[in-house]
């Protein structure tokens, strides 16, 4: 203890010794050599006894038709060197005080300061990007410094991320009802669930991190005889954890047209599977599915010490090689896969636990991590006979580890005095009756009996550990990791957690040591720092020891076939699935042999990588008709319908959740003598099957319909049964959508210094771990155009504002008051959006006339835009720009700041969609689509390059550039559109993200006029369809004629219309503006009404097809008619028609509009499709997804800036050399 330090406080680390190097002969029994070059040292003694008791009481919560001849009325007008240094370099903070503060928040107590936890971020190098300097003042156009919008920013600690634990709202009431005897009740639950002795007592509990293949956040509990660790792992809720495009190269798979050539697929990481699909819209037919339960290794490849874009996934039978678009993406995929593999193979009921008897602890050593934290290495012996050792690394903060170490010493000393002997775990299995106890615990944790969060968490912890019975749950969790004896031992001692083995040559005989798993040193590569040129290109290492191989399945059939005809005419087969009673006991199609039943069920799960919760119900031989009839077999499970091709050379599989099936019905077959069955899927094309016998077809229809009915919730029955078990899942799903992205950014910071370790933040249903960035960026959002172009940026800006950042919207001056009303800063740029709108409407699409007029008329317009944009972007740290603004990529290069693009229409090169400004009248294929992007890019640059290059040289101080040097295809790109409307293309790069719409909800402050409400009520009272018609700020040649056509169409369609005559508001003559059309009683001129308030209250909508308006109608599930005028509106009109949610109206007059109104208000297919799309979009959070993408791609965006700077330096150096050579030649 240092001089002047109070008892119970942590010793400060000397300024010159940040690594915590020191020495102290602290060991529980016999001091062993510190691994991996670590030096152990001592920390402060224990706190006072009363302080310990108080903290213990406060911390127990944690457990817990042909075209008409009429004219178009809408025609347009004009870790450093060791494990100890791992987190020192990353500056992570999490503390025991977070639990304490969470309890105080939950119980209404005044919050106390947990102490100063400031640490320096040692990873930032001197002279790093200016984007890192978030303290630079944001300067407005008036030159005054603007203040931060969130005052709480100033009080945050200077760490890379703060991990603060906050209670879920559901646990607030439970927290307030805690009682004094909670400690005894917790001890009782631990005793019963962990099979502890009756006299065993809980001594202390701490939050900590367990270092394995991943770094896991959890809690550790010290009892009088055991050391227990518990953590909630990722929930298996069916949602995708990571999606994107990957290329796979594997000669053993027939998924590539050319052997050995990488093929690109849409990849989805979800629960225990990694699935590859041909496209992001065909998610029922996987090309390849890798079961993570059988993965033995995930390896991110390096070449000469540098990360590559390649990674391997090794299973028990083969190795798959994947290629991503860049090394950042490869690192993200490998990290996510490691965490998911760990959670899949070590989780029981979405949690994991470790149990270490104190009598088997050989040594406890401590190492410093951060100024107020350390790591405890606990070395444990399996038994006195085997001499097998396990090393466990527990990381603590706020010096809780030092206190725990001394408590362990005390408890071990007490056990030695009592003569306690080592426990042989292989001979002492857990009682089998404790299996699957967590559901009962979840029931206890329901809201009606969630007395204390800590007790519920303790129940879950105990249930998880108690369910690790080797005799009942030995498969398939920990495969290929250990010998049978070691597996049996660890199943008792450590649950399902596989652990590394280390041998100490000085103390143990090599013949008696079992090398069960690669060590932490092998996993983290921490013994030596990364050195360029030191590593050869890595190949996957072969697994030398496998505990048990994945079962090789024999193709058994319950009815042996003698001819191919007998197989085609085979009868259906029924199976007695557990928990379902669809068939009679005397069913002649039922399999009666128990062995045959189990074998068929096992094959079913193996074919489609299903979990043990699924069971086979029935199977049928059939043809699947897609592009051509494909013969195979249908498997019906309890909740799933699968198909597998039986034709040689074909590997087609289908996995269709029956929750997505709306109906199925009988139909005639395409071929004579066959019987058809149509399966109707929500939001998807129907599937058509043909059966050789009518009996099989009818039976399949009956069974499918019965299963669908059983999956529908029954009021008052299923809801009650599920409420308790779903409580913890619901609470855990409240996790912030940006959490994983922030963890990814944190992992990238660690990886930048040479270490690769995924981090798993605990998915605790009772406490929410929030991660707050250390650095607060000033985000600049540059856009031009109409109100619809600015609105998404306001929504995104408000989301970034909640994250603690500063946001500046840079656009036309007329939007300033609107932007500021939402709490965002605003800076004006030149340009009249009405003039731009008139130009675009006059030409409609990209053509020579548009280019010529723009070059002559808008030369000064573009010049002023570039100059004012440069001035407005001063002082920002990250720039997000609509590429139509033209200036952003050059400004970001000059300011050396990260640069993102965001847009509402197709802009990046792809074969799936044409460029929004060159949309053909009919689909022309992928080559044409790609050509439109190349054509537009060149035309667009040709029109502005001379002005841009002059501006670059004179104003920005940069050299001239061209399309090749700009590398626009590498810029991180956000599409603020729904993937339901704009599915991401397979050829999109990993840095292109379709996030979902950025909705700006303004209905909360809107008070509708009484006349509008009465009009809507009258329409409902008369049983009339209510439609909205409005075209935003579109400029038309004759607004009066257009209004008359709209009114006549409404009367013909016999509907009621809410009208927004925005088309007569801009650039119209005074005579036109003064002429008004007399509106009938069925038309109400409402003006501007917030879309999020109005659209859910109407039956259909007619609009111009702007991105924002299209998103609002799709979000509300409203059938839509789009009359496009220019640009991306044609694209959206086609998309809405393609997905079946509306009609694209090429010509607007009374006849065409009235027919369209009748169609969208009466066609049940369009209505149902729009409703389904609305349900899908309502589940999206576009702003949160965009923020997560920005966090995850920030490192990549910075790397682009660095690369450009290095290229400039290299070019300048070469130019200087050439100049010197020329000078010498002149001499």
From Swiss-Prot:
Where UDP-alpha-D-glucose binds, per the record, is at 786-787, 789, 1060, 1088-1089, 1091, 1104, 1107-1109, 1128-1129
GO terms for CC? cytoplasm; membrane
Q: Which residues form each disulfide bond in the chain?
A: none
State the reactions this protein catalyses.
a sterol + UDP-alpha-D-glucose = a sterol 3-beta-D-glucoside + UDP + H(+); ergosterol + UDP-alpha-D-glucose = ergosteryl 3-beta-D-glucoside + UDP + H(+)
Q: How does it sit in the membrane?
A: Peripheral membrane protein
Q: Which residues form the GRAM domain?
A: 188-229, 602-668
**Coiled coil stretches, renumbered:** none
Q: Which Gene3D superfamilies match?
A: Glycogen Phosphorylase B, Pleckstrin-homology domain (PH domain)/Phosphotyrosine-binding domain (PTB)
Q: Where is this region: Disordered?
A: 1-76, 104-189, 449-484, 523-550
**Which spans does this entry mark as compositional bias, Acidic residues?**
114-135
Q: Which residues form the PH domain?
A: 239-342
Q: Which residues form the signal peptide?
A: none
Q: Which InterPro entries match?
A: ATG26_PH_GRAM1, ATG26_PH_GRAM2, EryCIII-like_C, Glycosyltransferase_28, GlycoTrans_28_N, GRAM, PH-like_dom_sf, PH_domain
Compositional bias segments (type: Basic and acidic residues): 48-57, 154-171
What SUPFAM superfamilies does this protein map onto?
A: PH domain-like, UDP-Glycosyltransferase/glycogen phosphorylase
As recorded in UniProt, its EC number(s) are 2.4.1.-, 2.4.1.173
Positions with biased composition (Low complexity)? 449-469
Which PROSITE patterns would you find in this protein's record? Answer: PH_DOMAIN (PS50003)
Q: What does this protein do?
A: Sterol glycosyltransferase responsible for the glycosylation of ergosterol to form ergosterol-glucoside.
Give the similarity note. Belongs to the glycosyltransferase 28 family.
What's the protein name?
Sterol 3-beta-glucosyltransferase
State the species of origin. Eremothecium gossypii (strain ATCC 10895 / CBS 109.51 / FGSC 9923 / NRRL Y-1056) (Yeast)
């Amino acid at each position: 203890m240092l001089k002047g330090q109070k008892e119970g406080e942590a010793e400060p680390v000397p300024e010159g010794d940040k690594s915590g190097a020191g020495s102290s002969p602290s060991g529980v029994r016999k001091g062993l050599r510190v691994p991996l070059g670590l030096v152990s040292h001592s920390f402060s003694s224990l706190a006072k006894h009363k302080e310990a008791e108080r903290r213990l009481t406060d911390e127990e919560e944690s457990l817990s038709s042909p075209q008409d001849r009429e004219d178009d009325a809408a025609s347009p007008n004009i870790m450093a060197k060791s494990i100890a240094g791992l987190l020192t370099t990353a500056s992570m903070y999490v503390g025991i005080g977070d639990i304490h503060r969470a309890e105080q928040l939950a119980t209404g107590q005044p919050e106390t300061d947990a102490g100063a936890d400031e640490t320096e971020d040692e990873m930032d190098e001197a002279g790093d990007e200016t984007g890192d300097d978030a303290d630079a003042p944001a300067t407005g156009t008036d030159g005054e410094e603007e203040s931060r919008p969130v005052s709480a920013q100033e009080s945050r600690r200077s760490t890379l991320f703060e991990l603060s634990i906050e209670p879920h709202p559901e646990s607030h009431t439970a927290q307030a009802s805690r009682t004094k005897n909670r400690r005894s009740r917790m001890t009782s639950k631990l005793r019963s669930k962990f099979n502890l002795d009756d006299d065993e007592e809980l001594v202390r509990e701490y939050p900590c991190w367990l270092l394995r293949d991943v770094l896991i956040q959890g809690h550790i509990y010290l009892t009088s005889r055991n050391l227990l660790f518990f953590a909630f792992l990722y929930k298996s809720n069916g949602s995708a954890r990571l999606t994107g495009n990957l290329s796979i190269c594997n000669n053993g798979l027939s998924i590539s047209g050319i052997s050995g050539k990488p093929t690109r697929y849409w990849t989805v990481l979800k629960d225990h599977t990694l699935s590859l699909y041909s496209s992001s819209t065909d998610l029922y037919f996987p090309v390849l599915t890798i079961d993570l339960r059988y993965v033995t290794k995930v390896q991110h490849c390096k070449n000469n010490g540098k990360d590559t874009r390649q990674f391997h996934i090794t299973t028990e039978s083969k190795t798959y090689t994947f290629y991503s678009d860049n090394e950042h993406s490869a690192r993200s995929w490998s990290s996510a896969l490691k965490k998911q593999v760990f959670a899949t193979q070590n989780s029981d009921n979405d949690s994991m636990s470790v149990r270490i008897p104190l009598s088997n602890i050989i040594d406890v050593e401590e190492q410093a991590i951060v100024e107020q934290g350390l790591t405890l290495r606990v070395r444990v012996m399996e038994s006195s006979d085997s001499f097998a050792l396990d090393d466990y690394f527990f990381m603590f903060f706020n010096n809780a580890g030092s206190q725990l170490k001394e408590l362990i010493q005390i408890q071990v000393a007490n056990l030695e005095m009592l003569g306690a002997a080592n426990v042989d775990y292989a001979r002492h299995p857990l009682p089998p009756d404790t299996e699957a106890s967590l559901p009962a615990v979840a029931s206890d944790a329901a809201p009606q009996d969630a007395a204390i969060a800590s007790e519920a968490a303790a129940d879950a912890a105990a249930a998880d550990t108690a369910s690790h019975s080797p005799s009942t749950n030995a498969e398939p969790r920990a495969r290929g990791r250990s010998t049978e004896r070691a597996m049996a031992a660890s199943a008792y001692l450590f649950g399902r957690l596989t652990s590394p083995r280390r041998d100490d040559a000085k103390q143990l005989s090599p013949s008696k040591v079992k090398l069960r798993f690669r060590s932490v040193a092998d996993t983290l590569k921490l013994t030596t720092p990364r050195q360029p040129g030191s590593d050869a290109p890595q190949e996957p290492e072969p697994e030398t020891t496998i505990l048990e191989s994945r079962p090789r399945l024999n193709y058994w059939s319950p009815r042996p076939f003698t001819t191919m005809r007998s197989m085609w005419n085979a009868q259906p087969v029924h199976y007695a699935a557990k928990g379902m009673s669809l068939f009679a006991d005397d069913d002649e199609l039922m399999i009666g042999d128990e062995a045959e039943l189990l074998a068929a069920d096992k094959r079913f799960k193996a074919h489609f990588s299903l979990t043990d919760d699924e069971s086979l119900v029935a199977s049928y031989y059939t043809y699947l008709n897609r592009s051509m009839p494909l013969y195979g077999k249908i498997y019906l499970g309890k909740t799933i319908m699968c198909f597998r091709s039986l034709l040689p050379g074909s590997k087609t599989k289908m996995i269709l959740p029956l929750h997505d099936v709306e109906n199925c019905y009988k139909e005639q077959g395409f071929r004579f003598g066959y019987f058809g069955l149509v399966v109707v899927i929500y939001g998807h094309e129907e599937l058509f099957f043909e059966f050789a016998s009518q009996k099989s077809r009818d039976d399949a229809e009956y069974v499918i319909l019965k299963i669908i009915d059983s999956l529908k919730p029954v009021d008052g029955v299923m809801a009650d049964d599920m409420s308790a078990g779903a409580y913890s899942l619901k609470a855990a799903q409240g996790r912030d959508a940006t959490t994983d992205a922030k963890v990814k950014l944190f992992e990238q910071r660690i990886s930048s210094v040479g270490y690769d370790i995924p981090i798993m933040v605990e998915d605790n249903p009772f406490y929410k771990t929030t991660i707050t960035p250390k650095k607060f960026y000033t985000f600049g959002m540059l856009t031009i155009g109409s109100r619809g172009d600015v609105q998404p940026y306001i929504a995104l800006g408000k989301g970034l504002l909640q994250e603690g950042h500063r946001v500046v919207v840079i656009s036309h001056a007329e939007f300033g008051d609107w932007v500021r009303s939402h709490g965002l800063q605003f800076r004006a740029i030149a340009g009249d959006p009405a003039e731009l709108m008139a130009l675009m409407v006059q030409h409609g699409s990209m053509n020579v006339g548009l280019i010529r007029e723009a070059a002559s008329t808008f030369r000064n317009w573009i010049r002023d835009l570039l100059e004012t944009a440069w001035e407005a972007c001063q002082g920002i740290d990250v720039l997000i720009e609509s590429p139509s603004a033209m200036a952003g990529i050059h400004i970001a290069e000059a300011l050396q700041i990260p640069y993102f693009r965001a847009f509402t229409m197709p802009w990046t090169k792809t074969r799936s969609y044409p460029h929004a400004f060159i949309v053909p009248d009919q689909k022309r294929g992928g080559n044409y689509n790609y050509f439109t992007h190349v054509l537009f890019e060149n035309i667009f640059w040709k029109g502005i390059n001379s002005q841009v290059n002059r501006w670059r040289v004179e104003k920005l101080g940069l050299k001239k550039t061209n399309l090749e040097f700009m590398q626009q295809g590498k810029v991180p790109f956000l599409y603020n559109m729904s993937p339901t409307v704009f599915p991401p293309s397979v050829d999109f790069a990993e840095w292109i993200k379709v996030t979902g719409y950025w909705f700006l909800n303004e209905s909360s402050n809107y008070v509708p006029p009484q006349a509008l409400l009465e009009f809507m009520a009258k329409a409902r009272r008369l049983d009339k369809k209510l439609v909205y018609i409005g075209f935003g700020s579109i400029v038309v040649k004759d607004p009066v004629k257009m209004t008359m056509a709209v009114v006549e169409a409404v009367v013909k369609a016999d509907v009621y219309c809410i009208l927004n005559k925005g088309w007569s508001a801009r650039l119209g003559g005074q005579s036109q503006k003064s002429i008004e059309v007399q509106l009938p009683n069925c038309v109400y001129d409402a003006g501007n009404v917030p879309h999020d308030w109005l659209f859910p209250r109407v039956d259909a909508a007619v609009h111009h097809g702007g991105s924002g308006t299209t998103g609002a109608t799709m979000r509300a599930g409203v059938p839509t008619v789009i009359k496009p005028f220019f640009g991306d509106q044609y694209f959206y009109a086609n998309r809405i028609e393609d997905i079946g949610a509306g009609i694209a109206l090429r010509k607007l007059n009374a006849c065409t509009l009235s027919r369209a109104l009748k169609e969208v208000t009466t066609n049940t297919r369009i209505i149902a499709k729009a409703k389904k799309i609305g349900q899908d979009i309502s589940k999206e959070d576009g702003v949160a997804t965009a923020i997560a993408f920005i966090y995850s791609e920030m490192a990549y965006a910075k790397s682009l800036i660095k690369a450009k700077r290095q290229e400039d330096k290299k070019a300048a150096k070469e130019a200087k050399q050439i100049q010197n050579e020329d000078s010498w030649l002149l001499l």
